[in-house]
Amino acid sequence: MKCSADVLIVGGGIIGCSIAYFLRKQGAEVIVLEKGDIGAQASSAAAGLLAPIRPLCQRDPFKVLQLAGLVRFSSFVPELEAVSGITVGYEQTGTLRLLPAEKLDAVQAWAEVWQHAGYHIEVLTPQEAYTRQPNLSSGLYGAVTIAEEAQVVPVQLVQAYAQAALNLGALLYAHTEVVALQRSERGSRITGLWTNQGDLLTCNQLILAAGAWSARCGTWLGIKLPVRPVRGELIALEQPSLPVRHIIFDEGIFDEDIYIAPKLNGTVVVGATKADVGFDTSVSAGGVLHLLTVATQLLPALAHCPIHRMWAGLRPKTPDSRPLLGPIPSWENVVIASGHGGFGVLLSAITGEMVVELVTTGTIPEIIRPFVPKENIVDEVNSHKREDAQGI
């Protein structure tokens, strides 16, 4: 095991592997530490949607970041596939967003604003919506289509990031937990990490990309990182005889968290629930019932489709549902990239590029300034910063 690198990354999910890839492009020596298998947590459990434009949404800083992530993906996929040798299943499927009655009056003016900004958005009558997707349930009020929205196969995407990083010379250590940290004499720099293998890995820079487990990293640093796991359950069904053509979103008719996404393997993914149940990744009967109830109310034909599989993953969520991106206060060489919630896939490339720009130039990119951890992150231990750590 190589025991030193310019940068150590804690977390081998889609964010950690993306950062590793972009760092290697800049020539930095990189080691990624992952407590389980590479990309086996939220990255592999996601639906892989690249669809941030909800009807009536506004372009606040988080939406600006999401839109940048969407634009970056379409141009970045050929590069990633070429370097990794892995296809990521990118499809610009477009979305069909089904509207409740209370959104109809405002949506036309909203759509015109976004159309003027260059997005291909259409407001549909019920009959036009049925033409796009004939097996929708009756009684629709209207819909919005957004051509730019897309999807990928998340398992293949995280594998591509990891393989691309490896092909450029990064080192990825699976089943390697951090158990303690080494500090500089002044105590404001991390100089290395001890692992459960008994190795001390030294570094100039530490990046925390541990997803739902990021709060545990905070205990090493004497701070509270406000990231918690939120379970999302999903079901894959076999396609109905009249196939689902677009990613369909319920925009508040029954449950605005529910979507139906057709996949290249002939399945339709229905997601996703949200549950604060700690690190429990079991699939609940109630979650399955809710997903199938809403999905079959939107597309009755799904009631006759065989279940292909069911699964759950943990999203890293912050109190304001915005990511933490940037330097950790009071530490000279620690950066966090976590808390992406359900947008980790969408934001993977833009996060990797922006974090690498920060690390290599020392300047915080303007687009991530709103997400830099604030000085008021709670000190939950004491002023001298703990050296021990829980394995993540």
Annotate each PLM feature:
Residues 144-197, 201-205:
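Helical element adjacent to the flavin cofactor pocket in flavoenzyme catalytic cores
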Residues 5-31:
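N-terminal Rossmann-like FAD-binding beta1-loop-alpha1 element of flavoenzymes
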Residues 48-132, 294-296:
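Dinucleotide-binding Rossmann-like beta1-alpha1 core, especially the glycine-rich loop
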Residues 86-97, 110-117, 121-168, 273-277, ...:
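Helix-loop-beta segment of a Rossmann-like dinucleotide-binding subdomain
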Residues 299-392:
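C-terminal catalytic lobe of FAD-dependent flavoproteins
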Residues 21-26, 35, 48-49, 86-91, ...:
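Active-site substrate-recognition segment that forms the wall
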Residues 64-67, 98-106, 144-163, 282-287, ...:
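Short beta-strand to alpha-helix junction loop
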